[in-house]
Amino acid sequence: IAKKFDHNIIETLPALVPLTFSEKILEMCKELSGLSVEAIVSFNKVLFQEGMLFTHRGLSGPSILQISSYWKQGDNIKVNLSPKLNVYKLLEEKRKLNPRLDILNIVSEILPKRLAQIICSENKVSGNISELSNKILKQLSENINAWLINPTGSEGYRTAEVTLGGVDTKELSSK
């Protein structure tokens, strides 16, 4: 009908939809399925600080659903798994105060234990914090405060809560 009145039609896309990932990240998500964390999820200058849920299909939860409306195929999103904390500063402080602390125990104070175990394993860190270089601590903290991930897609219209696009509302009047 809108085309008959010469209205511009914007391509429709699924929005407010869970994101899917490559096999490596998907395996991690499956291991953490059901775990929810408070996170900041961002794409370009758009960010949302809300819950993020690991599922057997990828990532979901309010922050992921929101960012899915802005994310473009092929681009990375950034996830801050500990938005209230500068993890690198905390790790430096812990190392100064008690160099014998186990890195997994420290990360488990910041994140749920299952997530902490996977992050430490993925970063190949274990043992006393005093044994870890600044470079390793910085890399570990970046994977917590600025985890860059590249979704392979979304779950599509099947699970989308809304649709982007359609009739260009700039061409409509409420009068």
State each model region's role.
Residues 117-175:
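A glycine-rich dinucleotide-binding beta-alpha-beta segment and adjacent secondary-structure elements
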